[in-house]
Curated annotation (Swiss-Prot):
Hemopexin repeat copies, ranges: 6-37
Compartmental location: Cytoplasm, Cytosol
Tissue expression: Expressed in seeds (at protein level).
Purpose of the protein: Binds hemin and thiamine.
Domain of life: Eukaryota
Subunit structure: Dimer.
Record keyword Cytoplasm present: yes
GO cellular component, one term: cytosol
Protein name according to UniProt: Albumin-2
Keywords: Cytoplasm, Seed storage protein, Storage protein
GO MF, one annotated term: thiamine binding
């Protein structure tokens, strides 16, 4: 557990979950995918 910063990477879902100061950010780091919305 990092103080004030926790980075959890979900490889199975090809998604990066960033927890910063109780803030939730979802980043899709899957390059070359046709899942662009």
């Amino acid at each position: 557990t990092l103080t004030g910063y926790i980075a959890n990477f979900s490889v199975l879902n090809x998604e990066a979950y960033l927890f910063i100061n109780d803030k939730y950010v979802l980043l899709d780091y899957a390059p070359g995918t046709x899942n662009d919305k």
